């Protein structure tokens, strides 16, 4: 093997050593390996439509943790991680010219247009410098080439059809082993400092003791989380029953932030599930973890199929909807002051921790698109900014789904905020945790403070439009759930009557917003 065979392993959303085909291939084909991560300045600019910061403080902290952890792991394996601030195509070009010995640039392929644009620029630079490009697919449970469809255009537009096809005909590739040693970079290369919050124009977020995701980034933490959730606590065995929880760390797997940055492989999770099913138990809960991984796969393959249409206002269905951009309404939504406690609690949790449960995400998305009639991209880009686990395909795919212009076979899906609050936070504990100005209201009454009598509000030290806002909007279907509230452990009915009648939601001409047949 020629001593000049140096491979640059460009890492992006694959910040791990286990089950990493880039490292696996480079170990067999290089004399020297340069693991490289670039803090791309484009990731810290504004979002496309509404100019929110693309990377918020929670995801940045998680990313910095992950980069630090990968560098530490690589050092334990005889290498290190080069870190640079700059566009990957520029950094790679400089390294090629500086070293004169780079034979190959290897990386995992991404899906969305901005990432694909970087890949095309890398290929151009490598072509100009007579350097080979080696790419891999490694972000999904099922490999792109193993799907039971002749081409990506044959991907079903309904998740259930996709799931049944891959479960019946697909196969999950085995996990690649973690290399005992990683070949070292050429001598003389500076590893480079890992940026700080200040250098990236951000302020480090404060920890919040109420957070349902108090975890840190990196492969080490990801594997520890899996061990805890599967093997130490057996929490996975009840996942299907607890996954819609709102409070606490272990009601769901919480794998998504590590999956988003590639700190853990979906195939490794699958392998551990299968091992758990053999050694402990196999039930609906263990299957449901795989079911959710398949949703993640599906959104990536949908993005492959439709390209930039996942970002279009009219969505995958090219459905014209007269979305509005009332920024006062949007500000109330994003700041958690809509006057609808279940919505506000979720939005405040997101703002203060970077995390929100899946149940919460579905509800606040439905409220923004179906109740407020706001452009779904406002919500998608706000989530992109704040979510610690932002994944472009999952985020935009889910927002399209919620807005009724994506992959949802059921038209007119609209969540009832009061019913949902009572179903998933029956006693109101979650709302009181994140909307402390309503702590004086007991039981399920906390979901509809505007329906309480003046004396009840006074007793709870709540003054509508002073200590807590009246709803910016209400929907007629909410009223049928007002009498079904728990007033505490005794589950007695909540009081009826109000000193305030909220403005009723009027039909804005968006027919699919409302359906009397749907009771979510």
UniProtKB/Swiss-Prot annotation:
Keywords: Chromophore, FAD, Flavoprotein. Residues 479-504 are annotated as: Disordered. One of its GO terms (biological process) is photoreactive repair. Belongs to the DNA photolyase class-1 family. It comes from Danio rerio (Zebrafish). Residues 5-141 form the Photolyase/cryptochrome alpha/beta domain. Its cofactor is FAD; (6R)-5,10-methylene-5,6,7,8-tetrahydrofolate. GO terms for molecular function: damaged DNA binding; deoxyribodipyrimidine photo-lyase activity; FAD binding; flavin adenine dinucleotide binding. It comes from the Eukaryota. The keyword Flavoprotein applies. May have a photoreceptor function. Has weak cyclobutyl pyrimidine photolyase activity when expressed in E.coli and when tested in vitro. Binds 1 FAD per subunit. This is Cryptochrome DASH.
């Amino acid at each position: 093997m020629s001593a000049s065979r140096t491979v640059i392993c460009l890492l992006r959303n694959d910040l791990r050593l286990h089950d990493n085909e880039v490292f696996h291939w480079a170990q067999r084909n290089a004399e020297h390996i340069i693991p490289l991560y670039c803090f791309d300045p484009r990731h810290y600019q504004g979002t496309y439509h509404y100019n929110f910061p693309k990377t918020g403080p929670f995801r940045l902290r998680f990313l910095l943790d992950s980069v630090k952890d990968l560098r530490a792991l690589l050092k334990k394996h005889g290498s290190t991680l080069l870190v640079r601030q700059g566009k990957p195509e520029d950094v790679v070009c400089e390294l090629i010219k500086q070293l004169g010995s780079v034979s190959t640039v290897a990386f995992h392929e991404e899906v969305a247009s901005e990432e694909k644009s970087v890949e095309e620029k890398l290929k151009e630079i490598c072509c100009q410098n007579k350097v080979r490009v080696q790419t891999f697919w490694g972000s999904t449970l099922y490999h792109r080439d193993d799907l039971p469809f002749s081409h990506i255009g044959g991907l079903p537009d309904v998740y259930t059809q996709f799931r049944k096809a891959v479960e019946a005909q697909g196969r999950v590739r085995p996990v690649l082993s973690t290399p005992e040693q990683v070949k070292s970079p050429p001598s003389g290369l500076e590893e480079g400092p890992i940026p700080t919050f200040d250098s990236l124009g951000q302020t480090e977020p404060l920890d919040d003791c109420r957070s349902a995701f108090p975890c840190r980034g990196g492969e080490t933490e990801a594997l520890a989380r899996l061990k805890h959730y599967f093997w130490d606590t057996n929490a996975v065995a009840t996942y299907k029953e607890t996954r819609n929880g709102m409070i606490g760390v272990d009601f769901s797997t919480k794998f998504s932030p590590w999956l988003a940055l590639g700190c853990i492989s979906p195939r490794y999770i699958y392998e551990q599930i299968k091992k758990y099913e053999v050694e402990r138990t196999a039930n609906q809960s263990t299957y449901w973890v795989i079911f959710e991984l398949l949703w993640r796969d599906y959104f990536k393959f949908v993005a492959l199929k439709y390209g930039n249409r996942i970002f279009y206002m009219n969505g995958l269905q090219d459905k014209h909807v007269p979305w509005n951009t009332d920024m006062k309404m949007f500000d109330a939504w994003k700041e958690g002051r809509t006057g609808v406690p279940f919505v506000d609690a979720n939005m405040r949790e997101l703002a203060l921790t970077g995390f929100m449960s899946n149940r919460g995400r579905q509800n606040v998305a439905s409220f923004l698109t179906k109740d407020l009639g706001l452009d779904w991209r406002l919500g998608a880009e706000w989530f992109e900014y704040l979510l610690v686990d932002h994944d472009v395909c999952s985020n935009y795919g889910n927002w399209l789904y919620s807005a009724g212009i994506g992959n949802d076979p059921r038209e007119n899906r609209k969540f009832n905020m009061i019913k949902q609050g009572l179903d998933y936070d029956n006693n109101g504990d979650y709302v009181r945790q994140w909307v402390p100005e309503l702590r004086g209201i007991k039981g399920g009454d906390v979901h509809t403070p505007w329906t309480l009598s003046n004396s009840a509000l006074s007793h709870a030290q709540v003054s509508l439009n002073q200590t807590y806002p009246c709803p910016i909007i209400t929907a007629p279907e909410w009223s049928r759930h007002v009498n079904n509230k728990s007033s505490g452990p005794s589950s007695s009915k909540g009081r009826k009557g109000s000193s305030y009648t909220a403005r009723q939601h009027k039909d804005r001409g968006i027919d699919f917003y409302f359906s009397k047949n749907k009771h979510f």
